[in-house]
Design a protein with these regions (language model features):
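C-terminal cap of thioredoxin/glutaredoxin-like
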Residues: 1-8, 122-202
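Short coil-to-helix leader/linker segments, especially the first N-terminal amphipathic alpha-helix
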Residues: 4-23
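Generic secondary-structure boundary/loop-capping signal
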Residues: 15-18, 25-26, 74, 105-106, ...
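A short beta-strand-turn-helix
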Residues: 19-36, 64
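Structural alpha/beta surface segment adjacent to cysteine/selenocysteine redox centers
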Residues: 34, 39-125, 130, 161, ...
Length: 202
């Protein structure tokens, strides 16, 4: 979902435990002691999510994550209850069992327009995953409930209507406050403005 003129909502959301927006297994990047957290809700088959991955996330890493000012979390929002978005989300989690969630995340977005069984198997081989364990994990579909719980949080609790969606919050590592929802694909400058606003509240 493109959103060049984003509508910001949820300023002043009450302080709440971080566990309301993260789980113990939510993949994250950056220093978890950083004062600002961005939670992305995304679909590996979404073109606008791929744009964020290619254009905006690298700038956020360079400007904020590498400086210890922001940390980043990825949660699943497959747009359909079945299909390659769900399969890809499961593949990333299965790779995560072998310590390579982010490596699979990157490759899935690099190949998002070509996703299929053959591509996912090739990506697992390229990452030198234990193929037997990866295949067993994929066949089990054991991560589907957690993936759909992410989707439920994005749609029902937070009210996102498409992908990607972002929750930007100030945090002390245990609780969050001053939450801001950014629906849709927005440029780095939009994140920069809101991150800097939150950093000034430290």
């Amino acid at each position: 979902m493109a959103n060049p003129d984003p509508v910001m909502v949820a300023y002043g959301m009450p302080s709440a435990p971080l566990t309301e927006i993260l789980t113990p297994t939510t993949p994250t990047l950056g220093d978890q002691k950083a004062p600002v957290l961005i939670v992305e809700f995304s679909d590996f088959t979404c073109g606008y999510c791929g744009r964020f991955y290619r254009e905006t996330l690298p700038a956020l890493k360079a400007e904020y994550l590498n400086a210890g000012k922001v940390w980043f979390a990825y949660r699943d929002y497959p747009r359909d209850e079945k299909g390659w978005g769900l399969v890809a989300a499961h593949a990333a989690r299965c790779a995560g069992e072998q310590g390579q969630f982010w490596e699979m995340h990157d490759r899935l977005f690099d190949q998002h327009a070509r996703l299929g069984t053959g591509i996912i198997i090739k990506l697992a081989k390229d990452l030198k995953l234990n193929e037997k364990k990866f295949a067993a994990c994929m066949d089990s579909e054991k991560h589907v409930p957690a993936i759909m719980a992410d989707r439920e949080l994005a749609t029902t609790t937070l009210g996102f209507l498409g992908t990607p969606g972002f929750l930007v919050v100030r945090t002390d590592g245990h609780r969050f406050a001053d939450a801001l929802m950014i629906p849709g694909a927005v440029p780095f400058e939009t994140f920069q403005k809101e991150i800097d606003r939150l950093l000034k509240k430290r």
